[in-house]
């Protein structure tokens, strides 16, 4: 058999170009590259931290006024009557003269919101004028708090209490006006200089129930724990006191005499011991001594008394 000729198999081999060798890449490694990269990364992180902090501070500075404005706007939307608090016009004027340990300290003139809270204004007016047969005259301020002073009202359980209930209307009318304030239908904000009637005690626990046998049947009765406000106590605020909004119906504001309120706040009082663990335990277990002691907290050592009070007959309010 004939062997194939190599020249015939590749006749153009000599005309083919020689293969091109692939380029030789420089594979030398730089020893100093990783440290330099690490150093650059550290520098970037440091700069990033500074930039982030600056951005955070700038954002807070920019957004804080916006958040405050949004919160105020939300409060206004939730309770649109808050914007009308400053627009209320007093319809009556009343005055109370105050003394400390027999020394007169001045007169407080109060403007009453008869159009907004007619029941509360009518009750306060009847007592301050003596029209109901009872009066705040010669009655004491029983509590002096950092933000407000509180008058004890008519606390007698004799003829005065019966007259107070019969002559000035029921407490329920005041509670209904207070509930309107909670719903935002009327303004009931305890700003500095506000005057309000205490209508409820938010710290008073709900009445306990017990089973008693009556006429051969078991009947559920409520046990009265303590006597609540009777709608004759009132407070005068020296600073904004939102904590009072759960118990006080705002009926007016101080027009003159805030200096008298400040003098009353300077009177020394019985130290509030509600933070004591012993008092807390006694209160939890229902020790009556704790209840009695609590009534004495923040009471003035001096005798702070309303020496005279009444309505001011004036057409200009």
Curated annotation (Swiss-Prot):
This is Peptidyl-prolyl cis-trans isomerase CYP26-2, chloroplastic. Ubiquitous. Lower levels of expression in roots. The gene is CYP26-2. Induction: Down-regulated by sucrose treatment. One of its GO terms (cellular component) is mitochondrion. Residues 95-311 form the PPIase cyclophilin-type domain. The lineage of its organism: Eukaryota, Viridiplantae, Streptophyta, Embryophyta, Tracheophyta. PPIases accelerate the folding of proteins. It catalyzes the cis-trans isomerization of proline imidic peptide bonds in oligopeptides. It comes from the Eukaryota. It comes from Arabidopsis thaliana (Mouse-ear cress). InterPro entries: Cyclophilin-like_dom_sf, Cyclophilin-type_PPIase_dom, CYP26-2-like. It catalyses: [protein]-peptidylproline (omega=180) = [protein]-peptidylproline (omega=0). Residues 1-37 are annotated as: Disordered. One of its GO terms (molecular function) is peptidyl-prolyl cis-trans isomerase activity. Keywords: Chaperone, Chloroplast, Isomerase, Plastid, Rotamase, Thylakoid, Transit peptide.
């Amino acid at each position: 058999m004939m062997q194939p000729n190599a020249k015939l198999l590749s006749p153009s081999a000599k005309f083919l170009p020689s293969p091109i060798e692939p380029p030789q890449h420089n594979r030398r490694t730089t020893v100093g590259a990783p440290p330099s990269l690490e150093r650059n990364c550290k520098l970037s992180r440091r700069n990033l931290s500074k930039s982030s902090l600056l951005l955070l501070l700038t954002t807070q500075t920019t957004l804080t006024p916006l958040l405050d404005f949004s919160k105020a706007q939300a409060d206004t939307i939730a309770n649109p009557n808050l914007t009308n608090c400053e627009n209320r016009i007093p319809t009556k004027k009343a005055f109370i003269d105050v003394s400390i340990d027999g020394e007169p300290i001045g007169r407080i003139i109060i403007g009453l919101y008869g159009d907004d809270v007619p029941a509360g204004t009518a009750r306060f007016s009847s007592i301050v004028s003596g029209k109901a047969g009872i009066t705040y005259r010669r009655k004491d301020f029983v509590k002096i708090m950092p933000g407000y002073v509180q008058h004890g009202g008519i606390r007698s359980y004799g003829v005065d209490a019966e007259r107070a209930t019969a002559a000035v209307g029921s407490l329920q009318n005041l509670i209904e006006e207070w509930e309107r304030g909670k719903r935002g239908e009327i303004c009931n904000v305890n700003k500095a200089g506000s005057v309000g009637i205490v209508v409820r005690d938010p710290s008073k626990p709900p009445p306990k129930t017990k089973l008693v046998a009556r006429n051969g049947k078991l009947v559920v009765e409520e046990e009265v724990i303590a006597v609540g406000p009777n709608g004759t106590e009132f407070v005068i605020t020296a600073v904004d006191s939102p904590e009072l909004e759960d118990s006080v119906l705002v009926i007016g504001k101080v027009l003159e005499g805030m200096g008298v309120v400040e003098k009353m706040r300077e009177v020394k009082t019985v130290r509030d011991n509600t933070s004591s663990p012993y008092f807390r335990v006694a209160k939890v277990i229902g020790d009556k001594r704790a209840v009695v002691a609590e009534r004495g907290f923040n009471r003035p050592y001096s005798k702070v008394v309303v020496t005279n009070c009444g309505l001011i007959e004036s057409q200009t309010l």
